[in-house]
Amino acid sequence: GHAIHSYLSNKTQNPIDANYVIFVAEVASTFNEALLMEDLLKKTNDKKERVFLINHFLDQFKGTLYRQTMFAEFELNIGRMVAEGKTLTADILCAEYKRLNEMYYGPDMVVDDEIAMEWARIPHFYYNYYVFQYATGYSAAIALSRRILNEGEKAVAD
């Protein structure tokens, strides 16, 4: 998705205008991926391949929409803690991260204690608050791709 977006952006715009922000990058790349997925699903008659593709789409949905939203909430919550004058320790970060995992995945999911440390290995958390853009970009891309697939040229023209 990102490769096609970057290629077309660089090919059709001057270098000064060809760059883009994260949200636009996510919309464009996941939009292209959604169109590709639809095309692959239409072309296959193989049941195993179809199951694989649907599973891949659902994994993307979980990872991009659900998990990134949890990441954004983690960042928001710890940012609020700092604003309230609290000192962030590893224990506080671990407790908050585990609490969110339990909340997001629900009581029927077994959440191992070790998940509490996962926050420490996620590179997104070493940069400013931006992961919410993955979820919002994905949502916009899926909505746009559905519209184009359902309405065709009219949606493209709009």
Predicted regions and their residues:
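Contiguous, function-dense segments enriched for cysteine-driven chemistry
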Residues: 27
